Amino acid sequence: MGRRKKMVERVTTLMNEPEKIRNIGIVAHIDHGKTTLSDNLLAGAGMISKELAGRQLFMDSDEEEQERGITIDASNVSMVHTYNNEDYLINLIDTPGHVDFGGDVTRAMRAVDGAVVVVDAVEGTMPQTETVLRQALREHVRPVLFVNKVDRLINELQVDSQEMQVRLGKVIDHVNKLIKNMNPEKFKAGWKVDAAAGTVAFGSALYNWAISVPMMQKTGISFTNVYDYCKAEDMKALAEKCPLHATVLDMVIRFLPNPLEAQKGRVPTIWHGDANSEIGKSMASANADGDLAFMVTDISIDPHAGEVATGRLFSGSFSRGMEVYISGTARKSRVQQVGIFMGPERLEVEKIPAGNIAAVTGLKDAIVGSTVTTLDGMTPFESIRHVSEPVVTVAVEAKHTKDLPKLVEVLRQVAKEDPTLQITLDEETGEHLMAGMGELHLEVIAHRIQRDKNVEITTSKPIVVYRETIKKKIEPVEGKSPNRHNRFYIYVEPLDTAIVEMIKSGDISMNLPELERRQKLIELGMGKEEAKGIVGIHNSNIFIDITKGIQYLNETMELILDGFEEVMRAGPLTREPVANMKCVLVDAKLHEDAIHRGPAQVIPAARQAIQAGMLMAEDCLLEPYQKVFVQVPQLTMGGATKELQGRRGIILNMTTEGDLAIIEARVPVAEMFGFAGEIRSATEGRAMWSTEFGGFDIVPTSIQTEVVGQIRERKGLKRDLPKASDYLSM
């Protein structure tokens, strides 16, 4: 215990010296060695025993993580490293590499300033490497590179010293190419990784050694020596001469920014308030004496302390008992405890100043993405934008009726802990629906509900999440209120792809100042009148009012938008969410007496005009796709391509590297169930594969009627397709 206590003392001292702090994340493709690297860094810092490092998976503290051998949540830990005889505080977040848990990576990137990108020397950069690098650059998080599993190049692939250096050079070039393509400005500003400069390290996380150019200069060890040690399988000696933690953490301290340097550049990216205001200046300078500005990036449940909100403190200081505002809520909250994480343990401290990652209890109203502040009316931080969308749903029921109230509360909690999970109640069937990033994501959540929350549940077979959209523009449709006194004339048309992308990325939203939003839309080709008339955005759909001088319309607009949002949540074809559509109100006739234009009159009138309009505009289904990357020996390539094409997959690219074939395909999620078993048998168990979200596309006409019929039947609707007249005659 003495060692741990001493560590806490060192951590709490360094917390107050921002230039000595590094907030970093470790990111990579699944199985490239992030968690093993994290454990060895902790061992080097004296947090866990060196014998267990790489095998203990301290960061994978959850049973499910150890069992499946993957990281599911992002884990936090604070530790101390000595560089040039000075102590530094490193707040480290280990993130998942599996595509189903990408939401954790996105949120972790908001909390950190730098990232160690881990790439397997044998596999090279993979789809998730690209995804996590893109997320880091988007959040203004600076990368350095660690090329892992160098020993495998030498001992398994039997490459010589020269070939090893060529292969490592290729990995570096590929990472730089990605950075350059994703963000040319940052690349020009020196954000590339460069072995000669020292921003790249090579090694083996499993065998606890790493080398970099500065480390070579310090120890006299060359690439040839590294090759000889690996060939002789004497990696223990190599680990003594070039310990992994020293090489990697030296690189982190030397090349990744401290909060004072980082926040100057990061704050304008993640906060769009007035940079010259007191709070703007305070965040840019990580001022511990300014108003509090804290961004929640994770919510976890502690059995004793309740909800723990973890996040990045950009300004001010947290201490017990202080009162704070939480964005989106009216009342104040009182902070109960403040602390830091040491892996699974949360340690209480008296005070945490700006520039640190803090864990706080007492913020019951906070959700992931909340802004916590002492300043009433502060502009909140930009919302966290996730790269993928939920594509698979299961229905969840309590096994025993007595557990139903508990299940409702538990689902509320898991949705808070994991914002990439969508929980909805199907009003018609009474089922709770849980939508997630993939089968594995939902399996893990279901298992945790039973294990951690003690609620026995049954789940349905996974169902694909579809979207509805339209194919063409139509003339305005009249929607009448039930009392016939109010009429709305609305037309619908597909929304331009460039605008859809800007809405999805958060660059266009109702939170933007109106003039700024209007300007962006005009630049994207929208007419001035329409850009000025936007009154509502729901998911990737917009509602525009271009009417002129209609009496009582202002006080009715909220109800019209309620009708619009109802249809956007459940379209007329299959009651699935609507995407990529523009609704335009061109005229309205309203009763002068408010009693005759209440919710029961206005909402159905607006709703029916949009529903009928969508059916006239060729309402159709969009289905989610996954990009699938398969690595197989060339001999079994035929089996792999046949398997992908048999699932309505389109082969996008095929390359060869040595005797390996790399296939890139795009396959509908509906066809991916059971893929793991089938691809193994098609390739004699020799395929390695991974997936990433591949967007939505229109369901082929040949199967559309069948798919629509199945969805309608499942939801208890008539199998026959609805007609526009079904809505207009109501």
Curated annotation (Swiss-Prot):
The keyword RNA-binding is assigned to this record: no
One cellular-component annotation, GO: cytosol
Identification of the protein by name: Elongation factor 2
PANTHER family, per database record: ELONGATION FACTOR-LIKE GTPASE 1, TRANSLATION ELONGATION FACTOR-RELATED
Binding site for GTP: 28-35, 94-98, 148-151
InterPro entries according to UniProt: EFG_II (IPR041095), EFG_III/V (IPR035647), EFG_V-like (IPR000640), EFTu-like_2 (IPR004161), G_TR_CS (IPR031157), P-loop_NTPase (IPR027417), Ribosomal_Su5_D2-typ_SF (IPR020568), Ribsml_uS5_D2-typ_fold_subgr (IPR014721)
Keywords from the named record: Cytoplasm, Elongation factor, GTP-binding, Nucleotide-binding, Protein biosynthesis
Transmembrane segments: none
Upper lineage: Archaea, Methanobacteriati, Methanobacteriota, Stenosarchaea group, Methanomicrobia
Domain called tr-type G: residue spans: 19-260
Gene that encodes it: fusA
